């Protein structure tokens, strides 16, 4: 990069101001504070968007703990907010675990797809892939201005991100071969116990499935509509996972230009007698320098390690201000 490159704003202001964004994924290594960051981002978005949904795709489902409010698979208004909603789902469970009200009106096709997929459970990999596809299609059809995804740790998230390309490619090849393999498809249908479905019907189902996957894949790769925020801490393994995640996202064609470095120590004079604080500070400084070198064309937001946990809507509301402007350790803490 050029030596005179101006550093980018060290905040998430760019995301909050990008009105075209529809999906914002927040992810990283386990234990780095993804849920706190995604919840804080959702709070800031609720100030400028008509309606915001934060959705957990992490089986651990920590957003209920973060907001100190029980959430389910139905979008529920967050206490203290008029336009912020939250829900928790497990993509691996598929649409069978989602409530019937999701499948009214325009989503009737998804209802049919869910029941048709019940007969395909013996096919390894198909179930998980289509669960992801259907959940994402479902979210795409919801009437929220923007959706924030609180994702599972890196490995699980990479599968979520990569699935549209993999399935789209596989289904495309299968459909191109459908004329050659029609007899085999008929045998395949019989093996699945779908005697009333012929090869043409199955081909149509695959065609419909491909259409859904293609729509999701197009939105995934559209930087005007979708972006990814990586959360890490200033330690070796977290930085390693972040670089792996950034490379995979880039390979998949998914926009990523924001990194949050969480749980940072900002040394005060009162910490002079704390040798461990000083040691941790030096370690973090080393990795912050590496982050600055690796991601000079990223918005890098630095968040503090606090004395108290961030829990409850008011605590998150207060902490979320750190996403919009650099943290000032000299500022008076808000109660």
Swiss-Prot record:
Its EC number is 3.6.-.-. Disulfide bonds: none annotated. The active site is at 58. GO terms for molecular function: ATP binding; ATP hydrolysis activity; metal ion binding. Gene3D superfamilies: P-loop containing nucleotide triphosphate hydrolases. Zn(2+) binds at residues 274, 277. Pfam families: ArsA_ATPase. It is an enzyme of class 3 (hydrolase). GO terms for biological process: tail-anchored membrane protein insertion into ER membrane. ATP binds at residues 29-36, 235, 262. InterPro entries: Anion-transp_ATPase-like_dom, ATPase_ArsA/GET3, ATPase_ArsA/GET3_euk, P-loop_NTPase. Belongs to the arsA ATPase family. HAMAP family: Asna1_Get3. ATPase required for the post-translational delivery of tail-anchored (TA) proteins to the endoplasmic reticulum. Recognizes and selectively binds the transmembrane domain of TA proteins in the cytosol. This complex then targets to the endoplasmic reticulum by membrane-bound receptors, where the tail-anchored protein is released for insertion. This process is regulated by ATP binding and hydrolysis. ATP binding drives the homodimer towards the closed dimer state, facilitating recognition of newly synthesized TA membrane proteins. ATP hydrolysis is required for insertion. Homodimer. This is ATPase ASNA1 homolog.
């Amino acid at each position: 990069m050029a030596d005179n490159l101006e550093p980018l704003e060290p905040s998430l202001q760019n995301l909050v101001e990008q009105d075209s964004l529809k999906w914002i994924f927040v992810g990283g290594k386990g234990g780095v504070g993804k849920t706190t960051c995604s919840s804080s981002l959702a709070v800031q978005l609720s100030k400028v968007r008509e309606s915001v949904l934060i959705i957990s795709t992490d089986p651990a489902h920590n957003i209920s703990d973060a907001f100190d409010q029980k959430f389910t698979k139905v979008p529920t208004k967050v206490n203290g907010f008029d336009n912020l909603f939250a829900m928790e789902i497990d993509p691996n469970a598929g649409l069978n675990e989602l409530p019937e009200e999701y499948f009214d009106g325009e989503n009737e096709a998804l209802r049919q797809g869910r029941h048709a997929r019940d007969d395909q459970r013996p096919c390894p990999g198909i179930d998980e892939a289509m669960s992801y596809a259907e959940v994402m299609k479902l979210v795409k059809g919801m009437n929220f201005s923007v959706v924030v995804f609180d994702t599972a740790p890196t490995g699980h998230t990479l599968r979520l991100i990569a699935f549209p390309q993999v399935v789209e490619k596989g289904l495309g090849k299968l459909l191109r071969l459908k004329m050659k393999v029609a007899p085999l498809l008929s045998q395949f249908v019989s093996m699945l116990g779908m005697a009333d479905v012929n090869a043409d019907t199955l081909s149509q189902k695959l065609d419909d499935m491909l259409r859904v996957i293609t729509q999701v894949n197009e939105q995934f790769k559209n930087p005007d509509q979708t972006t990814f925020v990586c959360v890490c801490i200033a330690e070796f393994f977290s930085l390693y996972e972040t670089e792996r995640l950034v490379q995979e996202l880039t390979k998949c064609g998914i926009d990523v230009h924001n990194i949050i470095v969480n749980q940072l120590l900002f040394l005060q004079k009162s910490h002079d007698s704390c040798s461990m604080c000083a040691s941790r500070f030096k370690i973090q400084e080393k990795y912050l320098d590496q982050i600055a070198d690796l991601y000079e064309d990223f918005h890098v937001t630095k968040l503090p390690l606090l004395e108290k946990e961030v829990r409850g809507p008011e605590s998150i509301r207060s902490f979320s201000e750190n996403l919009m402007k650099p943290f000032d350790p000299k500022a008076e803490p808000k109660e």
